[in-house]
Structures are given as structure tokens and as C-alpha cells.
């Protein structure tokens, strides 16, 4: 793929070494896709915009926040976005990628072996409800992300218990309505969290609208969260 095929909006966010790593990552995911259906967003703009740019703009364009040298967890990593994108552009951070599908976590491990990441990257094959109740992980992260995983109210129950007192949760969403906002606020109130900021962006080349919701703890999240497997999705907290 030629550099010219990468949108300028993305070229402006990356250096040459990072572009090379993202190309290598694309090739490896393409290879693994023959064995495991990781993603359909792997060619052309689907990869460079819907995967790479969509993962990165929230980190690169929020210059008022420090995203470097952090302990980072991505919940429901799938093929590795935004986790790998964050790792490539923040090489001093420690990365944890979580997915309940063993096929996907096996593929993530293969990718890590193939790409020369500078980070320490750990892959966990488990449900986040289990991980979030372990003392070695609970309240242990500076940044927790979830992209294309369930609804925001459900995801916030996964994210808040993982965050340190000054941590930041990042929820990637497509559309965002006033009703979504009200529901999330009610859920966060139960979890002792709050919405910090909502940012919107039209992705380049007509790839659609993206909303990113930043959430943070306002006090310690009650120990009973996250609830046991499936409850957050089946019975979202409503305040």
C-alpha cells in the first residue's frame, strides 16, 4: 500500500516508524484472517480510517490530556484495536488486551510475536467480569477502553472498577443521543463515576460519525461491581 493511500488526517498523526508498524500489523491481521475471522475492516480505508484513525484520533487530538507512560487495558480487544494502535503510538505504556474468545487471544499473541512492539503487552483470555473482581487488576489502570462492545451503560460497569482514582475510561460509540446520555449518567451515579467529556468527529472519506465518551471515577467504585457474568448486559444499572 502506498503512503498516498493513507489519509492526510492520519499521516499528520504518525511518524515514519509508526506507519511501517501499522503496515506490518495490517499484513499480519490479513494473514490471520484466513484462519480466524478477526475483522472485515482490513483493506484500504476500512483499515486506515475505520481501524487506525478511529482508534487514534481521541489520543492524538486531545493535547490537554497526558496519555504517555500509562497502564492501559482494552476490553473486548477483538483484532487488537484500539489496543495495538495505542501501543504503537505510546511505546512507554504497559498494555493489557482482554477478550473472552480464545481464538482471538491466540491471534493477538501471534501478532505480538510478529510485530516489534516496544511495550510490554499482555493478552488475557477471560471475561472482564472475572478480571474486574481480581485484586491484581481492580483499580489498577490509568486508561481503560472499550470499542464496539455492548452498550455504554453496560460497558461502564466493566470499565469503572478497573480504573485508578485518577484513571480515565474511554468508550467508543457511533451515534449518541440524549437518551444514551441520561442512561449513562444514571449508571455512572451507581458506580460512583461521572462523564468527563464527550467528543465527536466525522471520520475522513465519509466513514461516518464517531463519538467518544470519557468517563472517570468520582469516588471508589463499590466492590460488588462488576457483577457476575452476563448481568451487566442483561440488567443494565439504571440508578
Curated annotation (Swiss-Prot):
Gene: rsmG
Family note: Belongs to the methyltransferase superfamily. RNA methyltransferase RsmG family.
Tree of life domain: Bacteria
SUPFAM superfamilies attached to this UniProt entry: S-adenosyl-L-methionine-dependent methyltransferases (SSF53335)
Annotated EC: 2.1.1.-
Enzyme class: transferase
Protein name: Ribosomal RNA small subunit methyltransferase G
Provenance organism: Prochlorococcus marinus subsp. pastoris (strain CCMP1986 / NIES-2087 / MED4)
NCBIfam families: rsmG_gidB
Pfam families linked: GidB
S-S bridge residues: none
Residues annotated to bind S-adenosyl-L-methionine: 76, 81, 99-101, 128-129, 147
InterPro entries linked: rRNA_ssu_MeTfrase_G (IPR003682), SAM-dependent_MTases_sf (IPR029063)
Keywords: Cytoplasm, Methyltransferase, rRNA processing, S-adenosyl-L-methionine, Transferase
Keyword Zinc-finger: no
Chief location category: cytoplasm
Compartment(s): Cytoplasm
GO molecular function terms noted in the UniProt entry: rRNA (guanine-N7-)-methyltransferase activity
Function: Specifically methylates the N7 position of a guanine in 16S rRNA.
Gene Ontology cellular component list: cytosol
Amino acid at each position: 500500500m502506498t503512503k498516498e493511500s493513507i489519509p492526510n488526517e492520519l499521516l499528520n498523526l504518525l511518524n515514519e516508524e509508526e506507519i511501517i508498524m501499522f503496515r506490518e500489523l495490517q499484513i499480519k491481521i490479513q494473514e490471520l484472517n484466513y484462519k480466524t475471522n478477526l475483522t472485515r475492516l482490513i483493506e484500504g480505508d476500512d483499515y486506515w480510517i475505520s481501524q487506525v484513525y478511529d482508534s487514534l484520533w481521541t489520543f492524538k487530538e486531545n493535547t490537554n490530556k497526558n496519555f504517555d507512560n500509562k497502564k492501559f487495558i482494552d476490553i473486548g480487544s477483538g483484532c487488537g484495536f484500539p489496543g495495538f494502535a495505542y501501543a504503537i503510538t505510546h511505546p512507554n505504556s504497559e498494555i493489557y488486551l482482554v477478550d473472552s474468545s480464545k481464538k482471538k487471544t491466540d491471534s493477538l499473541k501471534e501478532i505480538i510475536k510478529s510485530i516489534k512492539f516496544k511495550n510490554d503487552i499482555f493478552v488475557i483470555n477471560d471475561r472482564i467480569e472475572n478480571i474486574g473482581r481480581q485484586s491484581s487488576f481492580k483499580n489498577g489502570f490509568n486508561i481503560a477502553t472499550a470499542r464496539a462492545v455492548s452498550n455504554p451503560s453496560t460497558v461502564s460497569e466493566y470499565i469503572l472498577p478497573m480504573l485508578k482514582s485518577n484513571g480515565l475510561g474511554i468508550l467508543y460509540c457511533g451515534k449518541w443521543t440524549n437518551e444514551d446520555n441520561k442512561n449513562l449518567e444514571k449508571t455512572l451515579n451507581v458506580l460512583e463515576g461521572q462523564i468527563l467529556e464527550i467528543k465527536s468527529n466525522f471520520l475522513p472519506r465519509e466513514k461516518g460519525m464517531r463519538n467518544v465518551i470519557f468517563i472517570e471515577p468520582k469516588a471508589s467504585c463499590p466492590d460488588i461491581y462488576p457483577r457476575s457474568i452476563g448481568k451487566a448486559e442483561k440488567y443494565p444499572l439504571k440508578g
